[in-house]
């Protein structure tokens, strides 16, 4: 499943950026992104388990709805993070943090792509 692999790739590359950019302390926005991504991953796990039998399409549908809500929350976090970041005077910090924030937001987009795959499977099998 390419969509699922993309989620993992963006989480991994975002974490690697923390090391590459030598970010010693995460900020509140990164913590929020981590929480949203973790919750979306839990919904993906629940959805994958439900797809094995397709006995409970409502649970899978609920996962899709929640993942979509979490992706929207990721968009909001990015907006707030960038607004706060651009008040910073250090251009190097702006570049580093903007890159990391955008990577984590893309991870939430990729979670939504997985939810879209779930929805397509449900449509075909119900």
Which residues fall in each region the model found?
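Cytosolic, long alpha-helical scaffolding segments
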Residues: 1-126
């Amino acid at each position: 499943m390419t969509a699922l692999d993309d989620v993992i790739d963006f989480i991994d590359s975002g974490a690697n950026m923390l090391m590459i950019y030598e970010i010693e302390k995460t900020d509140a926005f990164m913590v929020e992104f981590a929480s949203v991504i973790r919750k979306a991953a839990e919904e993906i796990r629940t959805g994958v388990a439900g797809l094995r039998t397709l006995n409970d399409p409502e649970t899978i549908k609920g996962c899709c709805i929640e993942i979509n809500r979490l992706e929207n929350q990721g968009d909001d976090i990015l907006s707030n993070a960038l607004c706060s970041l651009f008040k910073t005077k250090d251009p190097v910090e702006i570049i580093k943090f903007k890159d990391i924030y955008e990577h984590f937001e893309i991870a939430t987009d990729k979670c939504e792509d997985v939810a879209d795959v779930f929805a397509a499977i449900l449509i075909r099998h119900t």
